[in-house]
Structure formats: C-alpha cells, structure tokens
Amino acid sequence: MTTRIGVALGDPAGIGPEVVWKALIRRQPDPRITWSIYGPAQFAQSVALSLDPDSEWFDGWKFRLSNGAEGELISVRPDLSITSDLIGRSSALTGTVLYESARLAIKDALEGKIAAVAAAPHTELSVNQAGIEFSGYPSLLSKTAGLSSEVILLLIGGHLKVAH
C-alpha cells in the first residue's frame, strides 16, 4: 500500500514550482509514497519537463520522474492560463491559483484522499491582489478546516525552532 502526499505548488510566479520539482527529482524515491501535485497542470508539467526531460507522462497528468518517483498532477483552475511571462511578477491570477491549489490540497487531506499536505513558497501579495484575505498557509488551513483563527506556524530545522 502506498501513501499519497499532496504538495501545493505555491506561487506560480515565484520559486514554488521549481522547488517542488527539484525536491522530487533529487530525492531518493520511496516506493511507499506517491505524490499529488496541486496547481495549474500544463504549467506544472512544463516546469517538470524543463528540469527532468526524461520524465514520463501518461493517462492525462500521471507522471514517473527519471528517478522513479511517481504521482499525478491535480489540475487547479484549468480556466486560468499561467504562462512564462508571469514568472517573477505578483498578480491576481497567480494569487488565485496559489490559493485554490493550497485550499484543494487541504480539502483532499480532510477528506482522506491524501495523507498529508506540504506547500511550496507563497506570496501573500499575489493572493491579496486577487481580493482574497490571506496571511499565509496556517490561517488558510485553520479556515478550511473550520478551526480557530488563532494559529501558530512552527518551523524546525537542525537546532533551530521558530514559532510564528
């Protein structure tokens, strides 16, 4: 049995998509894990192929990276076109996609479709430009799950622990 882990691509205009794919490409794949990548599918696939041209794509948005990691893209807002000219620029369009990608991943986790959610870097400015009140992933998680709005993000790395 495999465990499915969801990853929201973050802001398509930023480093999120590249961070996600490089992390998956460079890690030793675990055959017990499959990945669900949430974001604009065509754009996400183009980033993946630019970093891993030997990856295989089949049955729509399913993939097998050259290192053997497997998963699928979960297409978010296919009505919105993310193009390379948007990279590096905060916009309402990229903010909408960022927000909807993370929200869908959280909903899928709450419904048991995936076991966990990770999210790539985001840009609050982009989401706010879309007219969506957003102060980061922790508040989005609590709002989507119907929890208290008082949340704390805990970052742990090496000997460093930060609560924000």
Feature map (PLM): residue ranges:
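Contiguous, glycine/small-aliphatic-enriched amphipathic segments in soluble metabolic enzymes
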Residues: 1-138
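Ligand-binding "clamshell"
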Residues: 137, 148-152
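A generic local secondary-structure boundary/capping motif
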Residues: 142, 151-155
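Ligand-binding beta-strand-loop-alpha-helix segment within the catalytic cores
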Residues: 66, 154-164
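N-terminal beta-strand/alpha-helix entry module and adjacent surface
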Residues: 132, 142-145
